[in-house]
Amino acid sequence: MTMKIASAEFSRGIKGTDAILADGVPEVAFVGRSNVGKSSLINSLVNRKDLVKTSNLPGKTTEINFFSINNKKCYFVDLPGYGYAKRSPKEKESIEKLILWYLMYSEAPIAKAVLILDVKAGMTDFDREMVRVLREHDHPLVIVANKADKLNQKEMSAQLRAIKEAAHEAVVVQYSATTATHKERDALLRIIFED
């Protein structure tokens, strides 16, 4: 897969089985709790402010959104955020079922799963569970410790160490969707697109 992102377009949102899953295009799945900056991270990677709608209200996304990168060289797949406290138990359950269906049963050709954490909050139980699911289903994983601009160097290295330990030495990259330079963005894209 190529690393330079020349184009990024919204393809469609799905809530279950769909032909897009079987069209053979490799998928990069972005997963994480509500409010970790998933939409901002994808926007930062494609160098667009508004490809993925960001909202001040976490938990707005309730379907799986597909974005075609470089005319279907791959899809960036934005999964709904999990663990949002203000959702009703029924809504929470249906969102979590949708995420797990996609990761475990949909047979989507997932080339890489990008688990996004709020570096300040570190690894939550939900995130640990997600790491377990991704590993069990052999999805190559990279963890992005987002909102890196919120910590100083000392706090950052302590948090990164704790995240790596909790994730059993997964690849962990610090990042800030709001302040990332071109160089940082390219470095993260390289890791995402590595086989």
Predicted regions and their residues:
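Short, glycine/charged-enriched secondary-structure capping and boundary segments
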Residues: G24-V25, L45, P89-K92, R128-R132, ...
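Hydrophobic aliphatic residues
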Residues: L45-K49, L103, A167, I192
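Conserved nucleotide-binding/hydrolysis micro-motifs of P-loop NTPases
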Residues: K60, C74, G81-G83, K120-G122, ...
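Amphipathic alpha-helical transducer elements in NTP-driven molecular machines
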Residues: T61, K92-E96, L100, T124, ...
